[in-house]
């Protein structure tokens, strides 16, 4: 995929870092790998979206976090913290956190801090929207407290998904 992008754009500086966003050790290692190679970072786009309707009960990660929360909230926030120094070195450092159009379905939703891991009641959809709300709230926090870095949260509209990847649902 990187080679195809290099050819299409003419940019030889296209690379990737493999990371498991549900594993905070992997997130730390990926950030460190980037920090070792680069002097600055212009844009960090946090676009994680772990949302599987077939999951009927919370899955805990090695770190003891609910998997969707780890992937959709903890990892983007940790990456932002770890890469903050390189973003500050950029003339136009910015973080773009991708939220969800689906939050419009829940205009009065509040974060349920007592149920972040689904310990009381688990719903993959509600957990996902709670995660996206948490990421939005973290974006507002960072925007207020992190000077010199532009912080944006955007919501995307519905995305066409290849349902064949969910063959376990039929």
Regions found by a protein language model. Give the residues of each.
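Terminal hydrophobic/aromatic helix or amphipathic segment near a protein terminus
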Residues: 168-170
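Rossmann-fold NAD(P)H-dependent dehydrogenase/reductase core
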Residues: 1-165
């Amino acid at each position: 995929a990187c080679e195809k992008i290099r050819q299409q754009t003419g940019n030889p500086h296209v690379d990737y870092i493999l990371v498991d966003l549900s594993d905070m050790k992997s997130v730390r290692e990926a950030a460190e790998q980037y920090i070792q190679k680069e002097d600055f970072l212009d844009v960090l786009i946090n676009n994680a979206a772990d949302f599987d309707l077939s999951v009927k009960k919370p899955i805990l990660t090695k770190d003891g976090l609910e998997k969707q929360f780890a992937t959709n909230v903890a990892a983007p926030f940790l990456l932002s913290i770890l890469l903050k120094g390189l973003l500050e070195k950029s003339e136009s450092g910015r973080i773009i956190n991708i939220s969800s159009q689906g939050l419009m379905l829940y205009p009065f939703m509040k974060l349920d801090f007592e149920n972040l891991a689904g310990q009381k009641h688990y719903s993959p959809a509600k957990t996902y929207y709670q995660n996206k709300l948490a990421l939005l709230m973290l974006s507002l926090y960072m925007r207020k407290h992190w000077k010199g870095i532009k912080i944006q949260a955007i919501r995307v509209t519905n995305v066409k998904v290849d349902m064949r990847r969910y063959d376990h649902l039929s």
